[in-house]
Amino acid sequence: MCDAPRQLKAIYYRRSDRPRLHLEVSRFRKQLFADQLGWVLKTENGLEQDEFDTDLTEYCALLENGQLKGCFRAIRCDRPYLVRDAFPGIADEDAFPADVKAWEISRFGLHPDNSGLAISLYAAMFDFAERRGARALPALVDLRHERWLHRLGIQTRRYGEPRPVGHDVRGRVLFGVAGEIPIHEQRRRLGMLFAVPRTLLEVTDETSFDGLDRVSA
């Protein structure tokens, strides 16, 4: 008896577009980042949210056969965003972009049992960037994540050197590095790297653009 074919879907949304899905993503974030990874984060009623989760923040939920498997958060960099505003000493202020063509990626994660879907979540991230006309994706990452990106063939640019960014619940020092994935100068390479994963991914973009919030792709 053959297994049912795997159906992968990425949904881009704002919390007003999908309130029930957003609660599920916030619960997933609490379980992954606070409970499993031990990050010291603000949680309430089983949910993880912070001041950067606003009505204008955009999200990706990665679903396999209708079940949530991963997510990321995207904030346009002409607005307040995590790495610049919550960690101001991690790099020179001039290093951080502040324009509509840069989108910060944060809360990027998969359940450990679904690490095989990492390529699919990256494919969704670069699809999102293409749809938004992004030139760069700033982020705060640990050194292991940075090395993983390089192994995949993804070029990154640091804004500064690795620095302590806090402690986990066990008191261990956490190190991070601020930087970006420059999109424009490696667009062709990224297209080749993720061509196949993107063909296997059904994408639904439920965000609505109007007025100054519209970004041409």
What are these regions (language model features)?
Residues 67-71, 103:
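Glycine-rich phosphate/pyrophosphate-binding loop shared by adenosine-nucleotide-utilizing enzymes
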Residues 44-51, 161-167:
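Short, solvent-exposed loop/turn elements at beta->coil junctions and helix N-caps
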Residues 50-61, 70, 79-82:
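A short helix-loop-beta-strand connector motif used in the catalytic cores of GNAT acetyltransferases and
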Residues 2-48, 59-63, 68:
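Short amphipathic alpha-helix that is part of the acyltransferase structural core
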Residues 47-53, 144-147:
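Beta-rich nucleic-acid/ligand-interaction surfaces
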